[in-house]
Amino acid sequence: MILIKDLIVKLGDFSLVIDHLKINDGEYFVVLGPSGVGKTVFLHTLMGFLKPLKGRIEVNGIDITHWPPEKRNFALIPQDYALFSHMNVFNNIAYGLKIRGLSKDYIRRVVHEIASILEIEHILNRNVDSLSGGEKQRVALARALVVKPHVLLLDEPFANLDPRLRAKSRCFIKRIHERLRFTAIHVTHNIIDAILMADRIGYMKEGRFVTVLYPKEFIKTEYARPYLDEILPLSEYLKNSSYNN
């Protein structure tokens, strides 16, 4: 479980303020909000890239507030995926294992294991510049998951995908999460992604979480009103399905 208490992070004139937030083990937690409200600042604080002025971040009762990124066992997939263009797919996925000094046999085995789960074994020898947007996303996901993180952070993971690939990727990542059961924190400004993927939605406004609710509850709030045209077609579907119960 991740527990955040009395947290303040300053970045220029911007302040991220979190009085109390709990994210459960194995949860798919979606952070929703428009641009500029602090969603990426929140992820970078969890990763240890930004240092709080005050407050605590705990994981299973252990205070990790001042731990360096490499000690936290968190993995981040940035919006642009940040793949290494001079490496093939195998070496991109293996990068985090190599810098940990692990054996070649171990690296080869676990890279092929995660590539099989993500259905990308057939592209391991290709250069990343030759990949489609959906393939790049899966490579970035494989590179993050191969180090077996306790928490996976996703920053607008579908931003560069067309609507068809976006829908396909939603289903794929949800299926992988259900299989591997890591804790996921997914940042987006897209309410459809939030409703269809989240166990719970945390809505951010001006650097604060103003509500944390289950998707079926969130769509009834004032914070969902700006997205009304997008969510109306989903309302009946959610009402009559077991999705996100």
Model region roles, listed by residue range:
Residues 146-150:
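A short, proline-enriched helix->beta-strand linker immediately N-terminal to the Walker B motif
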Residues 105-123, 174-175:
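Conserved ABC ATPase "signature" region
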Residues 127-131, 135:
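Conserved ABC ATPase signature
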Residues 47:
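Helix-to-loop junction immediately C-terminal to a conserved catalytic motif
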Residues 152-156:
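Catalytic Walker B motif of ABC-type/P-loop ATPase nucleotide-binding domains
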Residues 63-78, 99:
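ABC ATPase NBD coupling module
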